[in-house]
């Protein structure tokens, strides 16, 4: 090597169209999801989400459920079936029907509701709960329903932040008996 410094040619990044809230909303109405919008604009899905939150865009059902999530859960907790079913329950309550769910997701949610009802249980979160068989990621356990649980599917404890909308999201659907009696 001669000792001379080699300079690499710097190729400017291709310019991209600025992402705006109106463009995001327009594409959502046309059926694009956030991942597809991100790919179109060369940004991350999180950037699309950030634009929507920052500039007052319409939130997706999942985002509303996340906004009202009753606990400060971390990455390993989302591996838990209990976490996933409660998230599905929140989406059902927000939409008011199964129309946005696959048949498989609907079946799993109905089965979960039936287990909670038949065994008279609620879901409790405590970050100190270690993972155990059937509860990957830890943090969750099923506990017997108490009078203090009222109509909620969750146990309110020192780790719970229950918003007014969350109180509606994390309660039984009004027509739960009818839903569970469907074949």
Swiss-Prot record:
Q: GO molecular function of the protein, one example?
A: DNA binding
Listed result of changing residue 123 to P? Thermo-inducible phenotype
- Organism field: Mycobacterium phage L5
Q: Which keywords are on file for this protein?
A: DNA-binding, Transcription, Transcription regulation
Task: Name the DNA-binding segment ranges.
Answer: 34-53
Q: Does the keyword Metal-binding apply?
A: no
Lineage, top-rank taxon, reads: Viruses
Keyword Metal-binding applies: no
Function of the molecule: Confers immunity to L5 superinfection, required for maintenance of the lysogenic state. Binds to multiple asymmetric DNA sites. Regulates transcription initiation at an early lytic promoter, Pleft, but also affects downstream gene expression at 'stoperator' sites in the phage genome.
- What protein name does the entry list? Repressor-like immunity protein
